[in-house]
Amino acid sequence: MFLLHEYDIFWAFLIISSVIPILVFLISGVLAPINEGPEKLSSYESGIEPMGNAWLQFRIRYYMFALVFVVFDVETVFLYPWAMSFDVLGVSVFIEALIFVLIPIVGSVYAWRKGALEWS
């Protein structure tokens, strides 16, 4: 028979972890001073008056390299637990991990062939 009281601790943690951030945002909104002025609209540069415009455009190439880095970084995070328990898992999990690694590699080769990773 399925008993709901087995999940009481889970629900308590879920409720507490949801209520605390909401309370923090509400309290900070109530206690924060509301001062609008030109100082709030300027960028802060270690106490020095800002020089030039704070809005800069970056080339799309930076975003492409950052995106490729994030994809492989997330892949590494997912593969680490698999590698730590490799001796316990079977061959089918190895094949699944191989497919998991091949999908971003195929995507990177495609982006490389299309010239998305060229720096020129």
From Swiss-Prot:
Signal peptide from the UniProt entry: none
Keyword Amino-acid biosynthesis part of the UniProt annotation: no
InterPro entries, A to Z: NAD(P)H_OxRDtase_bac/plastid, NADH_UbQ/plastoQ_OxRdtase_su3, NDAH_ubi_oxred_su3_sf
Reaction(s) catalysed (UniProt annotation): a plastoquinone + NADH + (n+1) H(+)(in) = a plastoquinol + NAD(+) + n H(+)(out); a plastoquinone + NADPH + (n+1) H(+)(in) = a plastoquinol + NADP(+) + n H(+)(out)
Root EC class: translocase
Its EC number(s): 7.1.1.-
Known partners and oligomeric status: NDH is composed of at least 16 different subunits, 5 of which are encoded in the nucleus.
Entry similarity comment: Belongs to the complex I subunit 3 family.
Protein name: NAD(P)H-quinone oxidoreductase subunit 3, chloroplastic
Natural source organism: Chloranthus spicatus
Gene: ndhC
